[in-house]
From Swiss-Prot:
It comes from the Bacteria. Pfam families: Trm112p. One of its GO terms (cellular component) is cytosol. Belongs to the UPF0434 family. InterPro entries: Trm112-like. It comes from Shewanella sp. (strain ANA-3). Signal peptide: none annotated. The lineage of its organism: Bacteria, Pseudomonadati, Pseudomonadota, Gammaproteobacteria, Alteromonadales. Coiled coil: none annotated. This is UPF0434 protein Shewana3_2582.
Length: 59
């Protein structure tokens, strides 16, 4: 299932409440402010702080 980019208008980083950006290559939502990447599973963003991966470790 593909990620619906319209969700970017309503979702926010659970840590800083800032905007998230979609990275199509890695299928992740990126918070540049916190340098965190959130996975997308079956088209659903997993916006849990404990599932976030630091950008320097994100694949």
């Amino acid at each position: 299932m593909a990620f619906d980019k319209k969700l970017l208008d309503i979702v926010a980083c659970p840590v800083c409440k800032g905007k998230l950006e979609y990275d199509k290559t890695t299928q992740q939502l990126i918070c540049k402010a916190d340098k965190l990447a959130y996975p997308i599973t079956d088209g659903i963003p997993v916006l849990l702080e404990n599932r976030a991966v630091p950008l320097n470790e994100a694949v």
